[in-house]
Amino acid sequence: MAKAYDHLFKLLLIGDSGVGKTCLIIRFAEDNFNSTYISTIGIDFKIRTVDIEGKRIKLQVWDTAGQERFKTITTAYYRGAMGIILVYDITDEKSFENIQNWMKSIKENASAGVERLLLGNKCDMEAKRQVQREQAEKLAREHRIRFFETSAKSSVNVDEAFSSLARDILLKTGGRRSGTNSKPSSTGLKTSDKKKNKCLLG
């Protein structure tokens, strides 16, 4: 019996507590949103299989607690992660400032060359914005990683962001059969044309 997928990629979401990591995962895996999630205790993961470049990719997306007291738990889960998504809240400047600390944590604990992605979540709350888009774009350029503004609540750019990271991992692992290795700006998930008014990819 043939496998139901061609590749299995482990992804990890990290960032401060309250930035919306769990909501992003639920939106991506189940296309659902619930604003009343309690703060994640320990680690949980969701699975979704997507089609990218003609390949069936099984994405195992791990949620982590942002609180420092759980750091010993999350450190172990960096190992084996092929992609890491750094999440901050556009309405919380401190969560953006702490991205540098999370970058350092990746460097100390993750595999060398792991694919990274920066997400500014809650872009539906424009009136409460504390982190300007240009600030995040600059940080992403400095670290040579992709950047999206997302909204788990409005489903803005969520599929696009996960698909982008999965595609980059596929390219790096040689899963693509033809074409160049330049990072494409388009994504491979078949999704409806969701709202993209204020939260465009960088």
UniProtKB/Swiss-Prot annotation:
UniProt: Mg(2+) binding residues: 22, 40, 63
Cysteine methyl ester sites (modified residues): 199
Gene3D superfamilies according to UniProt: P-loop containing nucleotide triphosphate hydrolases
Domain of life: Eukaryota
PROSITE patterns the record matches: RAB
Spans annotated as Disordered: 174-202
InterPro entries xrefs: P-loop_NTPase, Small_GTP-bd, Small_GTPase, Small_GTPase_Rab
SUPFAM superfamilies: P-loop containing nucleoside triphosphate hydrolases
Cellular component terms per the entry's GO annotation: bicellular tight junction; cell-cell junction; cytoplasmic vesicle; cytoplasmic vesicle membrane; cytosol; endocytic vesicle; extrinsic component of plasma membrane; Golgi apparatus
Short motif Switch 1, span: 31-45
Compositionally biased intervals (Basic residues): 193-202
Motif (Switch 2) on chain: 63-80
Coiled-coil residue spans: none
Cofactor(s) needed by this chain: Mg(2+)
Covalent link Glycyl lysine isopeptide (Lys-Gly) (interchain with G-Cter in ubiquitin), residues: 46, 58
E.C. designation(s): 3.6.5.2
GO function terms (MF aspect): GTP binding; GTPase activity
Keywords, alphabetical: Cell junction, Cell membrane, Cell projection, Cytoplasmic vesicle, Endosome, Golgi apparatus, GTP-binding, Hydrolase, Isopeptide bond, Lipoprotein, Magnesium, Membrane, Metal-binding, Methylation, Nucleotide-binding, Phosphoprotein, Prenylation, Protein transport, Tight junction, Transport, Ubl conjugation
Quaternary organization: Interacts (GTP-bound form) with MICALL2; competes with RAB8A and is involved in tight junctions assembly. Interacts (GTP-bound form) with MICALL1. Interacts (GTP-bound form) with MICAL1, MICAL3, MICALCL, EHBP1 and EHBP1L1; ternary complexes of RAB8A, RAB13 and either MICAL1 or EHBP1L1 are possible. Interacts with PRKACA; downstream effector of RAB13 involved in tight junction assembly. Interacts with GRB2; may recruit RAB13 to the leading edge of migrating endothelial cells where it can activate RHOA. Interacts (isoprenylated form) with PDE6D; dissociates RAB13 from membranes.
Name of the protein described by the UniProt record: Ras-related protein Rab-13
Name of the coding gene: Rab13
